[in-house]
Amino acid sequence: LVQEKGSPSLKKIAIIGASYLQNPLILKAKELGFETHVFAWQCGDVGERTADYFYPISIVEKDLILAKCKEIGIDGVCSIGSDLANIVVSYVATSMGLVSNTIEATRLSTDKHAMREAFERNGDPSPKSRVVDKEFTLSDSDLRFPIIVKPADRSGSRGITKLDTV
């Protein structure tokens, strides 16, 4: 069964993000017969060209994305490879009554400090962690070298620095 783009019976999926990380998802969704509606900052990423429809809306603009998804009448929303995108996925899906992780589960999986606190509360093994600011001094903590500094709001290895000395 082949359905034409724009067909009312074609399932419409919103994909948050258009980079090389999301492109395999875009391509697989199209292969499975979904009409792809991709949202991202317009910067020449591959998904801008491979999506059926591309909307140059930054993924931090969750209310604008929600409004457009309602207008389109999407059937689902997803992403891959981006913690920031997952926040928007949960927000849009929850707001539209679609299947998704809860907003709280998404918060715990995207805020690394909140995640570590949840691990500690539940007795799950996890590296020691501390929230630090410019006033932090190593002598006031029980942390020892090497120390890994990681932004609380970045996925994978983005923003990681290893410190071996002061």
Segments (PLM) and residue ranges:
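ATP-binding N-terminal substructure of ATP-dependent carboxylate-amine bond-forming enzymes
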Residues: 1-105, 121, 139
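Active-site nucleotide/adenylate-binding loops and adjacent lid/helix of ATP-dependent enzymes
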Residues: 111-166
